[in-house]
Amino acid sequence: MDIHVVDHPLAASRLTLMRDARSDNTAFRAALRDLGTMLVYEAARDLPVEHFDCVTPVATAEGTRLQNPPIIVPIIRAGLGMIDPALSMIPDAQVGFIGMARDEETHEPVPYLEALPEDLSGRSVFVVDPMLATGGSLLHSLKLLADRGATDITAICMVSAQPGVDALANSGLPVRLVTAAIDPALNEDAYIVPGLGDAGDRLYGPRNIDL
């Protein structure tokens, strides 16, 4: 599996703001928006392009555009915060949705929503979720996408835990990972250590629905 850890001072500074327990919802959202933009920029580096004649006010130049923009698939809830950064970089991308919550007792993903094109063959797919912890939610999402014919999938995560990275690498699914950091471990509650807490709660406040 191809793993790209984005090593850049601006990415590191935004990730630090997200990790900082003193950052309130507003500061966390702003840092996530900036870091999300940087990660999508890196993830899109190898997307196929096409060239065309672009008429400038002075002459004609060679223009470049994406040949086939990817579909952006956030894993709800926390992944919703990454839609705007992704669309700011790729405004003509389509968006699908996968809803996944975590059972706080078993730490297993609980799916509750699936809104995806039926046929994803030949499409690039960017799955966006701020955190890759155990890998359970992401693996479930990847299987849904692969079942629809997706063979070019990029997972974009702000922070990844080594156990989740290992689970992804051993899955045999067609995925590459773009992340800002790989943290070493999970605690007994399956939170990333040192991590950044619960990204959904820090974006939107505590989840108030029981599974």
UniProtKB/Swiss-Prot annotation:
Reaction(s) catalysed (UniProt annotation): UMP + diphosphate = 5-phospho-alpha-D-ribose 1-diphosphate + uracil
Modulation of this protein's activity: Allosterically activated by GTP.
One biological process term in Gene Ontology: uracil salvage
Binding site for uracil: 192, 197-199
Domain of life of the native organism: Bacteria
Co-factor requirement: Mg(2+)
Binding residues annotated for 5-phospho-alpha-D-ribose 1-diphosphate, in chain numbering: 77, 102, 129-137, 198
Example of a GO MF term: magnesium ion binding
Signal sequence range: none
Pathway annotation: Pyrimidine metabolism; UMP biosynthesis via salvage pathway; UMP from uracil: step 1/1
Manner of cofactor binding, per the entry note: Binds 1 Mg(2+) ion per subunit. The magnesium is bound as Mg-PRPP.
Family in the record: Belongs to the UPRTase family.
Function statement: Catalyzes the conversion of uracil and 5-phospho-alpha-D-ribose 1-diphosphate (PRPP) to UMP and diphosphate.
NCBIfam families, per the entry: PRK00129.1, upp
HAMAP family hit by this protein: Upp_B (MF_01218_B)
Designated name of the protein: Uracil phosphoribosyltransferase
Organism this protein belongs to: Corynebacterium aurimucosum (strain ATCC 700975 / DSM 44827 / CIP 107346 / CN-1)
